Amino acid sequence: ILGRWWRYKWITFHPSLTADSIWRQGDDINLYGSGTPVQQWMTYRDAETYRSIVRKGPLFPLNSLMYHGIVSAENAYYGLEKVQTDSDFADQVWSYFATGTQLQELYITPSMLNKVKWDTLAKAAKWSKENASVLVDTHWIGGDPTALAVYGWASWSKDKAILGLRNPSDKPQAYYLDLAKDFEIPTGDVAQFSLKAVYGSNKTVPVEYKNATVITLQPLETLVFEAVPVN
């Protein structure tokens, strides 16, 4: 792990130095945008990632970032030291694992989690492990969280793809779902999919995706889908 103060010259002038993950930059925890402190924390986390990593180095592998993990702890701050609703916690957990990060951090006080939260965490972590070979391809899709635009993460392999989307606004927003573009599918490969909701439910997302379409995300909605190619 290289922490906050990584420098490109280390890699340039020290070829023996390797790093599995680097810090996404910014504050450990902060708030931005709409909703509860948990929702604002998620927006800040992703806005910082977009500003410091995606825009400056669009080819940098997102699975090699240290995001500062899942936070629900007595020693946290900005409202994250308080018990979260089950739905807020689930949004935080699934959005975190959808980033594909290989450095999976938990900043958690166990007594603040009930059975529902533990089950959510276990399910998402297991899903992440089972799909590691796909999630290694994770890249950014959509817009800028700082502008409260719909954004997310996509990863693709020939046998399976994964799509995560989030609306950071407190208003419904449309998203142009073009999976050939979002998955960055090579020319000639299948671009039609059967979509299975892994987290969340949205009736505007087609179960059988054939062509680009406009979907609508509800305020502060987080979605995760698996996509299986259809010949």
Regions found by a protein language model. Give the residues of each.
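Active-site-proximal substrate-binding groove within the catalytic cores of carbohydrate-active enzymes
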Residues: 2-201, 216-224
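C-terminal beta-strand-rich structural cap/linker in extracellular carbohydrate-active enzymes
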Residues: 204-231
